[in-house]
């Protein structure tokens, strides 16, 4: 195999199915942008606590990796505090990324005043979305357990859970999310959110 002009320093980054190689590359690129991260590990923190599990609960509160646009969805985060003194005013946050690394939403419990004085032992944080606006695609959830001001990281789990959003009856075919809007023409509703899931 001969190198093409301008590619004499090319390096083979991976072998396998195209999707898998691209996923691995995009994950490495995204991680390398985070401050204090080595660009390889998917978890880091001071070890005072750990996120045990990330789940998506679909209709019926059942764990799943496949949901539909418009479904009621709960993002569940199980944690364990390892420090015997507990964590003072901790904050859980999570990021929802598209497969190419684009951040769709960053949610932080502090913004909704869900910050306990002290956190000990094991427990669960649930974040429920009544009508999931995401359109068809593959998404990753990352989670972090930090101090109240997000200056100290106890555990950060990057891309801890991947899930698929499957098609539903919505009228947007482009972009990342459904607006669940309705069209009116001359004062009459002609199509829209009423006919979605």
Where are these regions (language model features)?
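Localized sequence-composition bias
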Residues: 1-197
């Amino acid at each position: 195999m001969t190198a093409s002009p301008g590619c004499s320093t090319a390096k083979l980054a991976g072998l396998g199915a195209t999707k898998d190689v691209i996923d691995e590359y995009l994950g490495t690129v995204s991680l390398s942008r985070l401050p204090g991260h080595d660009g390889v590990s998917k978890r880091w923190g001071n070890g005072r606590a750990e996120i045990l599990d990330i789940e998506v609960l679909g209709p019926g509160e059942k764990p799943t990796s496949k949901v539909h646009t418009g479904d009621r969805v709960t993002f569940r985060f199980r944690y364990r505090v390892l420090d015997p003194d507990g964590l003072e005013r901790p904050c859980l946050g999570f990021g929802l990324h598209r497969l190419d690394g684009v951040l769709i939403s960053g949610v932080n419990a502090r913004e909704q005043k869900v910050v306990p004085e002290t956190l000990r032992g094991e427990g669960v944080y649930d974040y429920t979305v009544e009508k999931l606006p995401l359109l068809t695609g593959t998404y990753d959830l990352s989670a972090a357990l930090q101090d109240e001001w997000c200056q100290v990281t106890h555990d950060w789990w990057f891309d801890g859970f991947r899930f698929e959003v499957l098609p539903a009856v919505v009228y947007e075919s482009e972009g990342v999310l459904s607006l669940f809007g309705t069209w009116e023409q001359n004062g009459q509703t002609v199509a829209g959110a009423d006919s979605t899931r």
